[in-house]
Amino acid sequence: MGCVLVMSLVFHLSHEEYVTLLPKSITTAIGMGVSEELGGIVTITVAVIIITGVFGNIIGEFVCKIFHITDSVAKGIALGSAAHAIGTAKALELGEVEGAMSGLSIAVSGVLTVILSILFAQFL
């Protein structure tokens, strides 16, 4: 969310555009509700969430290799929190522990994003 705030300030996004992008790293079902509640454009939020998931799925394993992340728990949490359900599919390909941790991180990220997005929505 901090990245979205900085990008919004740099590119002078409106409040509506800003809150549209806030829920980019949670599942579509939760993200749609957050975007709608904060006054964002739900259809764009859905597209951004899907793009985030696909991009995270494509580069997630590569990023773990670059930064020498070998721990199964860390890989799962990274993929789940960054690329949500699509990342969890990738994590399950890597292993059972990665998949379990990815699923758990989706839930935790969802709850934290719902709470923090209310606070972050006030910044712009």
Residue ranges with predicted function:
Residues 1-9, 28-32, 53-65, 85, ...:
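Transmembrane alpha-helical segments of multi-pass membrane transport proteins and ion-pumping complexes
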Residues 11-12, 39, 68, 124:
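Short helix-capping/hinge motifs at transmembrane helix termini and TM-loop junctions
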Residues 15-44, 50-51, 55, 70-108:
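Alpha-helical membrane segments and immediately flanking helix-loop junctions
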